[in-house]
């Protein structure tokens, strides 16, 4: 919390919504600061005020103390301190700058190092001023947060910073200030942590506890408004490509606990270095894996009916080097491919026309640590997501992929006559419907408006 002129930075422990909470003041004694109280209420307040009322133990820092002696240790030759207890996340509902590129860059690098080394999440608010303020929202590894009304400062990080060109914010929330919006996103993250510890699909899963996993889960669930765009190329041979993974104002969209809960509890589904013999992933889920230089990994998806929207997010950490003056930068890319007869084929250009209505099938930023695919009206069929790495940094890099497809009916894909199996009777349905579709056309499995050999091939891939 940014302390006031009296050095007060603490929430009001006597506020009715905060009764029963234990506050540990890590930056020394403090009086009450209303800003801290209001943000805290939205995070962990009781009586229906906060989203995560089950949070009872809160460590409170002043912004100065947190960046300097109490945690990040800026101004010393030491690494950031180990967080006390079992801290999972830091909420930074403040902005600041030392007024010096070198100082600000070091603080940001210390924050990125701490996220990676201490396996924590940092939810950092962006400013509403006319110009960007770097601390702490410029961090590679953090989650930068804006307000869903778009009143925050947005766009790309300016020159002078290691992150120059990177997009901020990553996500927004429906609050009147970015401070409160950051608190809401922190509360959603806390709920996801609680779910992770108790749900049978994640409890005991080592990779579920990675901060990369939690970041991917959070971002994949963002709600995209009708005006949302990551500016994909709309026509020509590069239709479907973008090097701007997220919306310039709203990031991945508005944080949504229900969507992110689906992604998290869908569980981990392992990617593979080969496209041969892949099983189909669930409609929502995640994977946390590693990629080395030049390596690619794949996950297959079977889409039984037209998917009105699909969200896929890949994220990873950049590693701050010793001394916090530079980084080891990894560059990952993300692509959705058609899976025809067990062979991946590109959806860029004309190949994607009739397969997806709008959006991007390739995300290939050179600076962001998030790649995002967002497609509307994806036709029924089989697809693979390709994660790839193209840089010269040494060693393997942990990365996390989250995905969210529409929930599918319990019906068996390809079961056109509804008898629970895919067999010759379903083939007869395709033959009976051969040609151009008119009206409802269940035999058009590929969704291209024709019942033809492509539908037979797709049916055979579902054969019981």
Question: Residue locations for each model-derived region?
Answer:
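Acidic glycine-/aspartate-rich tracts in secreted/extracellular proteins
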Residues: 2-6, 149-151, 223-226, 317-319, ...
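Subtilisin-like serine protease catalytic core
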Residues: 1-71, 83-89, 99-103, 117-121, ...
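C-terminal edge strands of extracellular/lumenal beta-sandwich accessory domains
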Residues: 210, 214-215, 297-299, 335-341, ...
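Secreted peptidase-domain scaffold signal
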Residues: 237-332, 338, 400-410
